[in-house]
Amino acid sequence: MRKKLDPIHPGEILLEEFLDPMSISQYRLAKDISVPARRINEIAHGKRSISANTALRLSKYFGTTERFWMNLQTRYDLEVEKDRLGSRLDDEVQRLATG
């Protein structure tokens, strides 16, 4: 049986696909987008979610869409919750019978 991989936090994407390749420090990003450095650090370490406010700022800074960042966060949140619920969801919720 294949082992399920852990969901990828948006902070990992921010670090590995944006900050590291562009040689941008977390501190510089925070200053450039006018947010506390702690916010970026917590996102980068998977301790904080990307809010709509942060998504708007990141999208403007990196030339992406705000949906890109929000979709990363939403997908992560769903995967974490799916893992947490496990088979309980099937036991607790039945599909609505139609027609």
What are these regions (language model features)?
Residues 19, 30, 59:
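The alpha-helix within a helix-turn-helix
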Residues 24-42:
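Short alpha-helical DNA-recognition segment
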Residues 47-60:
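Short, basic-rich loop-to-helix N-cap that marks the start of a DNA-contacting helix
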